[in-house]
Amino acid sequence: RYAYVSAHFEGFTDHILAILDMSETAKPRLAGRWWLPGMWRGGGETPTWRTGKRYALHHALVTGNLAYAAWRDGGLTVIDVTEATKPRIIVHRNSDPPFGGGTHSPLPLPDRNLLVLADEPTSAKCSEGLRYIWMYDVREPGNPVSIATFPQPAEADYCAKGGSFGPHNLHENRPGSFQSSRLIFATYYNAGVRVFDIENPFQPRE
């Protein structure tokens, strides 16, 4: 019934979460919205993040009544969408600082109480540092715990190769596609496509 969309509304600094009621597919209706504090400039909010950082929803994936949302330099949120008209924040986690931000792709694995989260590079030749794929234990949605990072491709010097190096998109186990809670497919800009085995979530291996 509902679609969970990244949208830029007037008065906001960037993209936020919009929940659309698709009961009438020809007439989608806005049911609810959620944003990080500081994004609604038109409502008198003031951005709290550092100059040069971008707080913007890339996208959210929903499993059950929980939306796992990636906010670029704003990190990760887990949002309760039980009431579409009143989405409610459960937790906000941000690894920037000390890590570089760019949170891009969430992948919840509900059958294992895990979340894979990829941070995207935004510069060439690793000039802003490396970006990572993170593994979170989310058995307690209000307390996601980072338990591992995925190994970085190391068979070549990809930072020196030119262009961007680091994680980008994850295969999202969409209906009708290949689905796995053990094999993780990740694009890596100039390092191609990588497949990781997470049978042991504490030690992902390529």
Model-derived features: positions:
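Feature marking well-ordered beta-strand scaffolds used for ligand recognition
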Residues: R1-E206
